[in-house]
Amino acid sequence: MSRGRLLAILIGGGALVAAAFAAVVIATAGSSSSDELVLYSARSHYGEEEPFERFAADTGTDLRLRGGSASELYERLSSEGGNTPADVLITVDAANLWRAKEAGLLEPVSSAALDERVPEDLRDPDGAWYGLTLRARTIMRSAERVGPDEVTTYEGLGDPHWKGRLCLRSGTSEYNVSFVADRLAKDGRAETERMLRRWMANEPEILGSDTDVLEAIADGDCDVGLTNHYYLEREREEDSDFPVEAVWADQAGRGTHVNLSGLGVVRGSDNKQEATELIEFLVAPEQQRVFQQNNHEFQVAECCEFKRDPIDVAAAGARLDEAITLMDEVGWD
């Protein structure tokens, strides 16, 4: 069987995506196959090209990847309509999957393999999208100044004990918006607003990224924060003694909030069968282990060492606008 190619094309601000895949171009070039799948991907993680390269090699299918932010790719698909060359959309955050389905950008597929490999709450009930990887958004603490049991719940970040000691990423972060939308869907407006106002009463330092939050904790600028778990693992790759620890929040309650990256077949694709086969390949156990090893995300089928809060993508998606409004009202800029 001929060996497929993985080609990288940059759209807009997706430089990290292109950079991550650039090393694959030469290594897998040279296929004579006429089969090709076009992938629009918002994932920007280093070292994740291996599963795609394996698929290209195993099937002889060329993979043409076009990177950009989730919003850029959504707008591009919307503007291209039925003329889009895309076969598969790979995006981050459950909210973006929900939005793509609501806009009619995804084509439902039926696959016994996908239904078996992807848990029910991590796939669309109509088959429009499927979870690819999971990431926990949880509490981070200073390993030097905060004990493991000092804060164990999201609500606990609002304790006055943490006044002037809390760091948060900007409220414009899609990860934070999705977190709040999920709380609104599960806890209601009053309870969610009460929690956020208590957080804001602690006068948190607002920073630009999850990495900034972790480094602020390590440097002593704050003692606790909220980030996606894999950012901590990236820091530990650079410094095995990085002085920050994750706290798996709400283990005595619903469990730790998790979000997902996911993917679906683009509506109107002429390669629906091949696109479905790619998705099946990526959620198979061997490739899931590669994603976990290379980027420290969790597998969809075998997630976590902790109790995770189940995801209701549709319920949270319906509260996204309300989440943005509420965060603005409480001053989470």
Question: Predicted segment positions?
Answer:
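Ligand-binding "clamshell"
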Residues: 100-108, 120-127, 235-249
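Ligand-binding pocket segment of bilobal, Venus flytrap-like solute-binding proteins
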Residues: 171, 175-178, 182-249
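A structural signal for short loop-to-beta-strand junctions that line the ligand-binding cleft
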Residues: 84-89, 107-139, 155, 165-168
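A bilobed periplasmic-binding-protein/Venus flytrap-type ligand-binding module shared by bacterial periplasmic
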Residues: 138-145, 181, 185, 258-274, ...
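An extracytoplasmic/periplasmic, membrane-proximal ligand-sensing/linker region
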Residues: 190-192, 297-333
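Periplasmic-binding protein-like
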Residues: 164-172, 281-302
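Short beta-strand->loop
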Residues: 40-43, 125-129, 141-143, 149, ...
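Early extracytoplasmic/lumenal segment of secretory-pathway proteins
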Residues: 24-99
